[in-house]
Amino acid sequence: MTAPPNPPTYGWRAKLGVIVPPTNTVNEAEWNLAVPDGVTVHAARMTLHTDTTSVEGLNALHRDLAEAVHSLKPAGVAAIAYGCTAGSMITPRHALAEKMSGEV
């Protein structure tokens, strides 16, 4: 892929979003190491949820997920990844993607 004429300095190929919990210090660094030139990574941090077993706790997690997605939209990201193992383990396989897609 060649750069368009007069490209922006960063993110001329793509801008990617990643949502991480506040305690995660690895995801952003690894994404930035993995992307090729012209791709930038933009992170949003979610509230840390300790109650992920009750309906109320899960609903709170999903509300905060929606807020994180909305916070990345103004950056013009092409895609958003959810970098939270616990959150993705407690929600049915397609539910998080559907919730995130519904927010974009």
Regions found by a protein language model. Name each.
Residues 2-67:
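N-terminal glycine-rich anion-binding loop in soluble enzyme alpha/beta folds
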